[in-house]
């Protein structure tokens, strides 16, 4: 399966705005259509959140990005003073970003002298054109990012909406939930968490189809160790240095870190010392040193998973954890794959919920329904304070009997994504 075929499909409905950066594309997702904004594509370019090593123009020229440019949120090209090398020729100038190549003409750039210094036209969706014609200003090479993205379009859009929600005070998240009885709130969160789970399994399956089991595990682990702000840098490193390179034992984490920093690949401001990407790279090297074939060990753990009965809604998370021996199983899996002493909690809980279980279910090494129970009843992990405070204020998480769970958090996050999705489509 080609990567472009595995991504969410555009419906063909392009929604323009007077502000060109507010243009959005309606895309069909797992639970209905959603919108992918041009502004998000600009952010992907600014952060270089794609497989930069494979970047080529539509005419087949190799494109290397030394500096993606200064993000311009005012009139004119989207990025100023970028530095790129196209087919061995160094160029310095502006970059314009659109969802489709035809937006260049739709937005009236062809004869606008403000765009005379554009050296590269970045678009999301591939097209038949090799260059963008600019009237009297010559021709501009085109690059398409869709085939190079690490994730499904819906996953990028959902993460963007969820990050926006996480930055809000908890009081703003309570409004639509306060009137619900606690039991009903828990039922709704379980429904939303199941949707979140299904989407994560789908994303994991796409990654496995694209990279294979071992490399999908490798990419996922490094991405999670990048925390929120350095996921892209970690993914670039995972692409540049596959699992075999780490297993060979010659990884110089300091040199790898510095090489990525030279290209502006790290976001270090406000990062806690324990979460610093160099610290996490060294931790992953220790992990590989302990169990080099950890993806294979994980596969075996999935196939040998104990087959417990599914959770009843009336059974609390604490009761379920005691019944199935959750802590012992969690530690057993982490120890078997070599991560127990290398990935501290609560980030290890994110590895469990965002990585290990979706990967096992996506590959068919663990039944989805069985994995879902171990996923939603797990420890909550490293989550925004506003989300945790909201769930406690609702009474969903209360004391020892009903501790905060991974599923509670993921259910609330999915609800916010669904609200944002429908709002942008004018359906709320």
Segments and roles (model prediction):
Residues 83-94:
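Active-site beta-strand-loop-beta-strand hairpin of nuclease catalytic cores
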Residues 188-427:
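Hydrophobic, aromatic-lined core segments that form the binding pocket/scaffold
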Residues 122-243:
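Internal, well-ordered alpha/beta segment that forms a basic, Gly-enriched binding/recognition surface
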């Amino acid at each position: 399966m080609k990567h472009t075929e595995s991504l969410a499909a555009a419906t063909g409905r392009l929604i323009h705005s007077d502000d060109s950066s507010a243009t959005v594309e309606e895309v069909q997702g797992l639970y209905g259509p959603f919108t992918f904004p041009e502004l998000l594509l600009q952010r992907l370019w600014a952060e270089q959140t794609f497989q930069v090593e494979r970047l080529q123009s539509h005419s087949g020229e190799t494109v290397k990005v030394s500096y993606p440019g200064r993000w311009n949120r005012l009139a004119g090209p989207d990025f100023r003073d970028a530095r790129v090398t196209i087919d061995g020729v160094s160029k310095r100038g502006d970059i314009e970003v659109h969802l489709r190549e035809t937006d260049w003409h739709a937005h009236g750039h062809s004869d606008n002298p403000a765009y005379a210094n554009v050296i590269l036209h970045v678009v999301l969706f591939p097209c038949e054109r090799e260059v963008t014609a600019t009237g009297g200003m010559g021709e501009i090479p085109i690059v398409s990012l869709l085939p190079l993205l690490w994730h499904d379009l819906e996953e990028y859009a959902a993460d963007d909406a969820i990050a926006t929600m996480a930055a809000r005070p908890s009081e703003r998240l309570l409004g639509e939930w306060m009137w619900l009885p606690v039991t009903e709130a828990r039922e709704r969160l379980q429904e939303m968490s199941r949707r979140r789970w299904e989407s994560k399994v789908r994303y994991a399956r796409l990654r496995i189809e694209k990279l294979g089991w071992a490399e999908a595990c490798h990419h996922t682990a490094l991405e999670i160790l990048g925390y929120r702000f350095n996921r892209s840098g970690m993914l670039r490193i995972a692409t540049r240095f596959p699992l075999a390179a780490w297993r060979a034992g010659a990884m110089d984490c300091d040199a790898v870190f510095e090489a990525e920093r030279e290209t502006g690949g790290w976001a270090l401001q406000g990062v806690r010392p324990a979460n610093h990407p160099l610290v996490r790279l060294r931790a992953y090297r220790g992990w590989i040193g302990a169990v080099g074939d950890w993806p294979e060990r994980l596969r075996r753990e999935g196939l040998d998973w104990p087959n417990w009965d599914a959770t009843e809604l009336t059974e609390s998370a604490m009761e379920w954890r005691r019944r199935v021996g959750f802590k012992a199983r969690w530690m057993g899996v982490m120890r078997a794959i070599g991560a127990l002493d290398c990935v501290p909690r609560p980030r290890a809980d994110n590895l469990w919920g965002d990585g290990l279980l979706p990967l096992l279910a996506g590959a068919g090494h663990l039944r989805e329904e069985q994995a879902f129970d171990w996923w939603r009843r797990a420890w909550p992990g490293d989550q925004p304070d506003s989300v945790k405070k909201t769930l406690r204020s609702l009474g969903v998480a209360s004391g020892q009997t009903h501790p905060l769970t991974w599923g509670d958090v993921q259910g609330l996050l999915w609800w916010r994504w669904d609200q944002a999705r429908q709002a942008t489509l004018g359906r709320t």
